[in-house]
Amino acid sequence: GHVAALRYLREHTGLLTVNLGTGQPVSVLEMVRGFQQASGQAVPYRVVARRPGDVAQCWADPALAERLLGWRARHGVDRMCADVWRWQNGVARTLA
């Protein structure tokens, strides 16, 4: 998605927000579990009642990414968490 966005910017100017999600809802707990699996470490969390004003559900609409960039997410949350974990660890090593 990010590479497709950079290619798009070669030929277009201006600012644009494009969601690079799958279009499928993912809970916070699913994200926690995905990063636990990717890192091999426990991620501390607490399940508490929703606070006033908390959004019940929200997820990305990827239609614009597909239309403008010709890009569509191919992986689920576990693979995405693993990719982010791997990338972040690589960045940390280069900055150390």
Name each model-derived stretch.
Residues 1-96:
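C-terminal substrate-binding subdomain of Rossmann-fold SDR/epimerase-dehydratase oxidoreductases
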